Every structure is written in C-alpha cells, then in structure tokens.
Amino acid sequence: MEHEQDDPGTSTNVGVDSSVDDSMASLSICDSEHPNIYRQDIVKNKKTGSVGVVSEVAGDSDSDSDISDEEEDDDDDEDNDDDDEDVEEGKKASEENVVNGDGEKKADGNYKCGALEGDQIRVLWMDNTEPVQDINDVTVIDRGFLHGDYVASASEPTGQVGVVVDVNISVDLLAPDGSIHKDISTKNLKRVRDFAVGDYVVHGPWLGRIDDVLDNVTVLFDDGSMCKVLRVEPLRLKPIPKNNLEEDANFPYYPGQRVKASSSSVFKNSRWLSGLWKPNRLEGTVTKVTAGSIFVYWIASAGFGPDSSVSPPEEQNPSNLTLLSCFTHANWQVGDWCLLPSLNQSATIPLHKHVSKLRLYDSQADRQQKIGRDLEDVQDEVSGKVEPAGITAEALPKVTSDDPPQRNPSVSKEPVHEPWPLHRKKIRKLVIRKDKKVKKKEESFEQALLVVNSRTRVDVSWQDGTIECRREAITLIPIETPGDHEFVSEQYVVEKTSDDGDNTTEPRRAGVVKNVNAKDRTASVRWLNPLRRAEEPREFEKEEIVSVYELEGHPDYDYCYGDVVVRLSPIAVALPASSPGNSFEEATQQDNGYQDSESHQEAKILVDKEENEPSTDLSKLSWVGNITGLKDGDIEVTWADGTISTVGPHAVYVVGRDDDDESVAGESETSDAASWETLNDDDRGAPEIPEEDLGRSSSIEGNSDADIYAENDSGRNGALALPLAAIEFVTRLASGIFSRARKSVDSSSSDYTVENVYKQAESTNPSDETDSLDDPSPSKVNVTDNCESKGTQANAKNILSGETSTFLEDEDKPVPSEGDSCSFRRFDISQDPLDHHFLGVDGQKTKERQWFKKVDQDWKILQNNLPDGIFVRAYEDRMDLLRAVIVGAFGTPYQDGLFFFDFHLPSDYPSVPPSAYYHSGGWRLNPNLYEEGKVCLSLLNTWTGRGNEVWDPKSSSILQVLVSLQGLVLNSKPYFNEAGYDKQVGTAEGEKNSLGYNENTFLLNCKTMMYLMRKPPKDFEELIKDHFRKRGYYILKACDAYMKGYLIGSLTKDASVIDERSSANSTSVGFKLMLAKIAPKLFSALSEVGADCNEFQHLQQQ
C-alpha cells in the first residue's frame, strides 16, 4: 500500500528490540508454511526479536527497492562532484558500510541488486541493515491500511472483500533517553513538520495537492551558536549517521537529529540566530523543522469572483495554506519520527561550555571585524526599540566594568570616545544579554520520538452489508486489484446496456448496492426512481437480486471512504424549513450510528446549510472535505472547517484521483456549457486567461436544457443524468466557475513475450516473389503510385518489376479453413472497404518502391502461411488497408467467437508498425482490447517490450501481429494480460479474479456473436453466416455445459467436457443468471442463420 510518511530513522535505537511486546507474536497470521507477507508489513525476526519494515517481496515488481536507485546515486554523484568534502565523506561512508557481520550489505543503496527468490523478502531492520530474509524466519506483527482500501480475510482470501472505513493505530515510542512510551494513539501525535508531499491544501477558493516541500531547519551547534538554514537541500545537509530506515523525502529532518553540512557554505548563507559563522563548524543538532516553501499542484476551484478563475502560483508560503487533515492519524508506521505534545517533553541537549565571544584578539584587524559582527547581532536585538540606523559603538549605553548586566540601559545623548577596554565592556553587555535570551529560548526544545512498534485495528464494511469494528489488521490481507465486478455495499451502480447493443438511447436503471453474495456473484440492489431534476428527493424502487455481471460502476457517482470531494453546488434551492424536501436530508443526518463516535465527538453535525439557503462564503472551508460515511445512498462528508453534513451524490464531486481525466459532463460542449473549465498544465499560474474562457460562464444562462444535454445524454435516464442536471442546476443559480486540472493517464495494458509465437511466422520463406500467375484476372492486385487523392490504378507487375507479380492462387483453387467445408478463402483481395476504420486516412500519398515491396512480401506471407482460425482481406484500390478476423480457440473463454481487426500500413511502413483497430461492439473482453478499438500490444509499439517483442522493420510482419493476437491475447486466462498482474499468477487473489474475468468474458463473447450476426463487417458476411451455422450447435452446447457449472474454458473443440468430476459447480450463480438471460437471444440468432439448435430448446426457456 502507499505510505505517505516514512520518516527517516536514527541510530539511537539501543534496546528497541526488547521494547517490542512479545505478545504481538501471538497475533501473527504467519503460521502457515508460506505466510502472507506484503510490502510495508511490520515484521519481527523470530530469532533475534528485531523489528523491521518489509521493503520488497519476491515477485513484487513495484516494490520500493526498484525505484530509481541508480538515479538517486547519480544525483549524489553530481552533488559530490561540486564539493570535494562531500566526495571524501562519500568515500568514508562506502568504506564503513560495505558489509555487516552477517555478510549483508549495509543500507547505503548498494544492497538493492539481484532478484529475490520465491521464499525471500528484504527487510529494513531497526539496526540499520536490510538483509534478505527467508519468509518463514519472520512474523508479521502489524499491517497498515488506509481509508478506502480493499481487503479480504487472511483466513479466507477467496471469500468476500471489504472496504476499510476507519483506521485506529496505537504505537510505542522511543524517547531520546531510551524510555518507551507504550500504546499511544496516533491521533495524539504531531508531525515533525505540518505539511508533507501528497497532502491536500486549500488556498482561498482553490484546492491543491502538495508536490514538494522545502524545509527551514534550525541547527544548534555544540558551542551554543544557532542558525536557520532556509529552503535546505537534503543532499547538502545530511543526517549523521545514515538513516536506519529508507530515506524519507517527505520528512528528511526531525528535532534532535544530528546533521552535517556538505560544505561550510551551507551555514555561511544561513540566517544566524546566535553566534557567528565559522568555516570549520559543519555539524550540529536540529532543533526545529518548519516548511519554508511549498509547491502545490492545483486541482480544483469552487468559488466566485476573479480568484476562482486563475490558479494561484505553484510556489506558496505555508502561512497561506490550510491543511485538509482528516486522516493524518492513519499514515503512521514503524520508523517514523513524531512529536508528542501531550508528553510536554522538554529535552535539553548537553552542550559544550560556551566560549566567550569577547576573547582577546591577536590583531587589531581581528578585533575590528569581530566588533562589527557583534554589532550586527546587537542591532537585530534592539531593532524594535531603537532606531537601527543610528546604532554605533558610541551610541551604546555607559556601563562601568563593575556593573552587573541589567536590562535598563540608557542611550547617551552625545558620542563619547573611550579607550578600547571600556568599549569592549559595553558591547559585551548587550551581546551577553542577547545570548542568554536565545539560550533560554532555544537550548531546551522538544525532541522527536521514534515509532518502534505499532498495532493497527480497522473498521471494515463487508460485501454482505455488515460492518466489523476494530478488527486486527494482521488478520486481513490487502486486495490491490479488485475485480471489475467486486461491488461493495453502498456503491452506486447502473445496469449494463442491452445485449443487442443497438438501442443506445435505452434508459439504464441506477441504484445502490445493499449487499453482495461473493460466492454466488449476485448483488442485492435498490433501484432509484428516475429523477428529472437533481434537487428532487431520491426515492427507491424495489430491491432486486441480480447478477454482478449485469452491473457496472456508476460513471458519475463513484464514491469511496476517504475520497477528497468538493461541493458541486454551494447554493441550492432555498426551501422553507418545513418543506418536505428537507425531511429526507434531515432524517439521513440523524442516522449516523454506523460511524466512529470517537472521531466525531468534537465535530458538530449540522444540517447542511447550503442545502437550504444560498451562500457564497467560502471562508469557512465548508466546500471541500473527506468522505467519512456512506449510507442509504447518501454521503457523509467531514468538511475542512470541522463540520459534518450529509449530502446527496449530486452535491459533491471526487477530485484528485489519478484516473480522473475527464470532466463530469464528458469531453463535449456540454462540459463548457456547464462551466467546467479544464486547466491545462501550460496555463497553470498564468496571469491571464483567454477572453473566450472568461465569457463561458456568462453565456450559460442563455442555454436551454435541450441545448446543454442534447449531445451527450444518450443512454441516460433521470437517475443516471443527475450529475449533468446538478451542474445545470448550479449554473442556473450562480455564475461561479468550477475548474480543475486534468492529468492525462494512459490506459494500462500488458506486455507480451512473443518469442515462441513468432517461430512459425519467422520461418516463412518469402523467396517466392518471382512466382507469377499465368492467367491475368480482374482479381489481380493493383497498386497506387504517385497519384493524387482520387488515384489512378496501375498494375503491381508494372510498378515493382517484370520479375515480381501478384501472388494470388488461381480462383479455381480456393484454400478453405482446415476442418471446415467453408470455401471462404483465408486470404483474398476485395474491393471498396467502405466500412473500414482507416478508410478516411489518406492512402494515396506517394509511396516509395520499398513500401510496395514490403507490402508485396507481407501479402505473400499471409497467402501462404496463415494458420487455422485467421482470415485476411486486402483491398485492390487501397493496398494500405487490411482486415482480419480471428476465430476464438477452444479451451478459452473466446471459443468459437469471431474477433475483427482493421489495419493500416502507413507511408513509412515498415519503419513503423501498422496501426490497428479492434471492432469491439462496445465491450471490453480483454485487457488488451479496448471498447474504443485500441489494441495494446508491444509488437505494435502500443506497449513496452524488448527484443523481438517490439516491431523490427527488417523481420516483423503482419502475420506476426495476427499470430500474437491469436495466441497471446485471446488466451485461456486473459486476466493476467493486464500490466503487472502476472505477479498474481498462482495466488488466491489472482485465481479468484481470473475465474470471474473468464465468466464475464464468455458472456461478452456471446454478446459479440449476436452483434456480428446482426451487423457483419463488409466482405465477411459469408464467413460469419457459415461459421455460426456450422458452429452454432457447439456454441449452445458450451452454454449448456457452463449452465451446469463446468469451468469456463475447460471444453474441447466439440464443446465436450474433459473431466466430468473436477469441473462440476465451478461457475457462479451470478454467471448462470446472466447466461440464462442471454441464451434465449443467442438461440434465436443462431436459429436464424440455420444452426442446428433443436437439442437445446431448453435454453430458450431459461
């Protein structure tokens, strides 16, 4: 899990191991042969009792140990090159930290080389080492979770999942004197610095997320001198010794930490609070850490007036920012440094006895230099009381050498010139007075404490609708990638579109999940009555049990515990207090018993003011907050001003999610009309915005409802259209602007190893280019060369060479698919690709001779070497276009399906790979094949890869692409195609998700079949009809087998069951419910094309 606050450790951890409560071991879940251990787990060594944090688990490619270690080393080297002293320091550090007693490398960054074996983990121990450990040699004593995390029971990892709704952590703290403070709630802890990277902050009407923080560090030297290093760079002011846990970029410094400057210039340019700079003074103790400068990524604005239309500067003074700190207590972990205000600790650092600044000087020059600097200190001290411009040595008070220091000096009315010893005494009095004041203030400071142990308990909302409170975190495991159909209680959902895919305007019901049966994959949903306007009270229809495969997450109402939200409508209809419209909201506000009472004791639960009366005052910070409760379709929000209120789903909007790259109204003019304004990175902090943007909000009121929603409201009913209605409702009543930044995130996909799949394609011999047809026929290939957009046709034989010609077999020699009596050619030339996706691409541009030769070669390879189950059509008048269909292989959830792809060969082909488009019909049935037609494959350079996984202009071909799609994409377990999911292979979570993915994939495969029979792509009408006529019987036979519970993808080519015993009852009830709805439609469609369906009449009556 992501941990925002991994503070650096210290070497002052003597006796830490003995401080760990041995009873914690009894709570461990590590009793099995291969315990569940995850990155960031807190573990205890069974032999030594040491406590540490897991930094890497075998197979965890996203572990911290993989993060740019080389880049960090490069940064260190650059810094060292700038300073010889730092170079020497680095050499000493490398010599001291080569190997520890166990033969393991010290934690200096060089240990992170070499992959871990299957039963190994890497642990950061409190004794400054990070050795590789056997997974069975440690015991998990704590596990961290955040609000909104998905979890499962460690004893039943394939059972129901839950969502963390509250976190309570108690910690043991190591004090500087070696004492241990046990069982301290993290709610009582204070950060060593108020702001951290990743925090959300508010500045006026703007909400932002902190990207970077530069510290102001106050350093106390051993001789009592003190300075403040402004906007310090961690590479120039380094901890001594090196941190015992991973370096934390968020909190590199803490009070009580020893630091050393990389060069004397670090302190020379600092602000001196006491004493003077000396070039040989490089080490000191940190007494205070504050944020000096904060860099903020501005996300959203919800306000009125000019301040809300232009984002503030990226760099901000901390005093201008308000921290949104609802859940900071959940971010503590072993190794963090903290302050404990309730302890009232005042630790005094033993210092060397002060050396008088007024010692006798060896020369008059030294004396004058010293006097001048001391006078600067004096001037700072008295600047608020005396005119600073007139302060000179002569203007200081008259005091005899026998006078004791006192605080009632008088200023001489006229200059008096006196001998040096008396002059010296005058200066001494003020300087000593100042030193005493600073010493009294700074010598005693609150030192940080180290978190050496933690115990986490969480409240979990389970899929079955129950809420379990204060469960021990080590009895749960994190679910990092919940399946697409792992819905949870109180989640908003909508019905999927109809099976035929034709009626895009068909209303879809929206509802709230009350509970989910994880085993059966069914959900109990309370459907919402359609609403015409957002301000109407929500009413529920009947509660219905449906298959989870019939549902998908609500596209607009996607809320989770812990989400940061802003109020969409700070003003609403001003309803009378007695209006029935208020009773619904007030009733929901009174029923909050499911929340943690402790965390809400000091907060005042209010009836949402903005729900009842207009208001434009954002100074109370009641427009931004965190979701702390979900119940009966309503959302409880703890606002930044500390108040709590319950709002409807239309009233707030989630911000800050990484995948949040579209406005609520979509990428259409609707978005602009609703006064959602995209904030591009290039515009960030700009002093002005274009006039057309400024004029958007003023034109909103003139837009009618029809104008606003006409373009982008298909497929929505009243319940689904609530967010659009809410925005329109807001803009009718106010001219405010809700702006937010857009962050583009590429869709993730999977990488493929194509080495084995390519063997067949690479073995193709293209040396038959000189073969030609004896009988020139109209089907011979014509190519376009040096033509305008309309193009003139020329025979390929004349263009390429007299030796090279087209390579189609004689039409009297068709090559049908093996095992089928269908006469449909595997490769053929067609005319007029009218429905081709790339038809609009200009294919008549001038092409080089090499292009034609490569296309000629590719066509010949396809004509001679296409494997079973792949059919291709080229086009006589558009040689740059191809269309292919792949038949789904048996033993996969794609069995007997047809999958169509369009290809375009650009003018610089083969230097670049072809472009591809998948005819999805609107369904996502593979991680690499997107609804919008994107094909994600390393061979097409749409995903990363190495070696022969990527396109090679010299050896790659269209055939390789097709074989990759057939064998690597449309495989038996497509779930693991998703990027990073390969590490889940063999795990309970992975196999559970894979089974569910296969069930949904087969259902989508059936829908795709019906779609293709209704709308066959051009030039493949004959193939589609003949394929489903011949395979229809086996398709229905597979449906019948799966309805009986046999495992998806376990059937032979003739849809027979391989093992009658092992596969029974493998499919879920939810899958059977959904298939029972699809089967009758599929039966009818197959009957219409002439398939033999009589044996499966019972499917039509499901």
Curated annotation (Swiss-Prot):
Residues 59-88 have a biased composition (Acidic residues). SMART domains: UBCc. GO terms for biological process: protein ubiquitination. Its EC number is 2.3.2.23. One of its GO terms (molecular function) is ATP binding. Residues 579-596, 779-800 have a biased composition (Polar residues). InterPro entries: UBQ-conjugat_E2_core, UBQ-conjugating_enzyme/RWD. Keywords: ATP-binding, Nucleotide-binding, Transferase, Ubl conjugation pathway. Residues 31-44 have a biased composition (Basic and acidic residues). Residues 1-20, 25-111, 396-418, 579-602, 661-710, 760-800 are annotated as: Disordered. Belongs to the ubiquitin-conjugating enzyme family. This is Probable ubiquitin-conjugating enzyme E2 23. It comes from Arabidopsis thaliana. The gene is UBC23.
